[in-house]
């Protein structure tokens, strides 16, 4: 697979396809005519937003303009792979947040993710996408991600599990 390194992408966003309860989550990076779409999990989008939010709070205050780019996914939505590990760092001299999205590499025999503490020298390394984001882009991502995560199925008031439009088997009401 091909890896990408973008030092100043136009857009870094998240989005979904499908109705609540059946949504598929994606991360997307756009730079000029290049569109990179990666499939991910809802929890990864939420965790990335939480981490970004904390990182922005921890940084020295710096004036930055809010991102004004369109944060909707650009079609066609064709993921190049599914994201596995995600790394985030702060580049102080350039005042950039560096995000590394690594491809989820599955073990060929069992279809399960390889254990990171048991490297296989014969295993093929997965691809990655490395982006350097401005504070404005990160702030825009946080707002977009929170909107997406909260727009899912409402939680059951008794057990907290998601409730489908047709209801759900609540273990606390059984």
Predicted regions and their residues:
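The feature marks the first
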Residues: 1-58
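Intrinsic, low-complexity N-terminal interaction/targeting segments
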Residues: 1-26, 66-128
């Amino acid at each position: 697979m091909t890896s990408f390194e973008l030092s100043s992408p136009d857009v870094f966003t998240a989005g979904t396809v499908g109705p609540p309860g059946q949504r598929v989550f994606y991360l997307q990076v756009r730079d000029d005519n290049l569109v990179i779409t990666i499939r991910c999990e809802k929890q990864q989008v939420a965790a990335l937003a939480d981490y970004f939010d904390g990182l922005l709070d921890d940084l020295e205050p710096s004036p930055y303009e809010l991102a004004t780019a369109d944060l909707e996914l650009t079609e066609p939505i064709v993921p190049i792979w599914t994201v596995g590990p995600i790394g985030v760092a702060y580049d102080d001299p350039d005042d950039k947040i560096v995000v590394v999205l690594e491809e989820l590499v599955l073990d060929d025999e069992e279809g399960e993710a390889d254990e990171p503490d048991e490297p296989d020298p014969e295993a093929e390394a997965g691809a990655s996408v490395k982006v350097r984001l401005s504070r404005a882009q990160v702030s825009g991502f946080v707002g977009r991600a929170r909107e997406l995560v909260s727009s899912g199925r409402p939680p059951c008031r008794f057990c907290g599990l998601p409730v489908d439009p047709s209801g759900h088997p609540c273990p606390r009401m059984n």
